[in-house]
Amino acid sequence: MGKHEFLTPKAIANRIKAKGLQKLRWYCQMCQKQCRDENGFKCHCMSESHQRQMQVFGQAPDRVVEGFSEEFLDAFLTLLRRAHRHSRIAATVVYNEFIADRHHVHMNSTRWATLTEFVKFLGREGHCKVEDTPKGWFITYIDRDSEQAVKARLKRKRIKSDLAEDERQERMIARQIERAQQSMGKTNGELGDDASPDGSEGESGSEDEYSDSENDHEGQEEDAKEANKAAGKIAIALQRAVPGPKVNPLDDKPKVKFGFEEEDEVSARDKEKEELAKKKGKDAINAAEARRSALDELMKEEEKAKERSNRKDYWLCPGIVVKVMSKSLAEKGYCKQKGVVKRVIDKYVGEIEMLESKHVLRVDQDELETVIPQIGGLVRIVNGAYRGSNARLLSVDTERFCAKVQVEKGLYDGKVLKAIEYEDICKIFH
């Protein structure tokens, strides 16, 4: 029986049927050929081209199935990202839109046998937020592109703050060097003032003068004798003209020292020793304070370095109590409800078991908040320098939005953190 003419009703009907979606069981994924009925599909399976494709499949079946699975996943997520980027929608609706394309990758050629299994895979891998409801499975696409932009902005902000902190440290070190140089200059000046004017330089100068005058010593002796004679004559004349002062004959006698004078000398020496001891004590105290301040500065620098290394943009960890703040979950009654983090997926998505309903949800950390316990309760430090440590809540400052905690167990046991932000601590589930 020959083919129908091009413009006959039968030919037009055949072309219309070929454009639409046919039965999936008559589609060959390896050959990418759609058959219209069972007889046509049987004839295709007996063809040489199909037999060659089946030989290729038999050589590496796992690789072929994995390739089709990747194509199916990429195409499905592309459709979900473009058409339903920020909406919560039924999985069957998205799947019907996906298979509307005649050339789509069929699910029976992938490693997922059913749509339910595929939806569970999306939730398990963190591609979508998955909810099982009486009306079926609902999915919400997790927009990783906007998250990457936020992370990049936070990273740039953190780099700027680190650069500013480095500049402040450099200025502080420069000021310390200037103060040290000034203190060294003052100590050198004090040592120069304490030097005696009748020191070795004066002695050496007198020796030089004495050595220079040795050559003229013989010639000056005769002049000195004549000058002494004249001076003696003048002194005798003056004694006769002007009466001298009264001389006490007892002044020339040696004085007798009694015990009181010796005690005064001893007490003076003791006072000098006490003053020296006080001066040395003050110097020792100043040196100790300088060492203590240097040690404090080193500890502060180490604390800042630890803060920079342990400060991350993700904070979820298993075993903590969090509060769900997602508006999309408000319809189900999960908004502002507390749950326990059971598992963390890709660092940013948490598997939360609600405390009241015991339902398990997968929620991004941006839609979660930390929970602060009562005074005396146990918390976990989820971010910052002491990330991963358990601590005891001591007090809460509601004006500054920070808390005072004491680290328990571990390397920093007993250390008190006076002001740690609410976002860096979270209640531990008992």
Swiss-Prot record:
GO terms for cellular component: nucleus. Residues 376-427 are annotated as: C-terminal subdomain B. Residues 319-370 are annotated as: C-terminal subdomain A. GO terms for molecular function: double-stranded DNA binding; zinc ion binding. Residues 261-278 have a biased composition (Basic and acidic residues). Keywords: Coiled coil, Metal-binding, Nucleus, Zinc, Zinc-finger. A zinc finger (C2H2-type) spans 28-50. Residues 179-230, 261-284 are annotated as: Disordered. CDD domains: KOW_KIN17. One of its GO terms (biological process) is DNA damage response. Residues 191-224 have a biased composition (Acidic residues). Residues 51-160 are annotated as: Winged helix-turn-helix (wHTH). A motif (Nuclear localization signal (NLS)) lies at residues 155-158. Transmembrane segments: none annotated. It is found in: Nucleus. Its main location: nucleus. SMART domains: Kin17_mid (SM01253). Residues 147-183, 283-312 form a coiled coil. Belongs to the KIN17 family. This is KIN17-like protein. It comes from Oryza sativa subsp. japonica (Rice). The gene is KIN17.
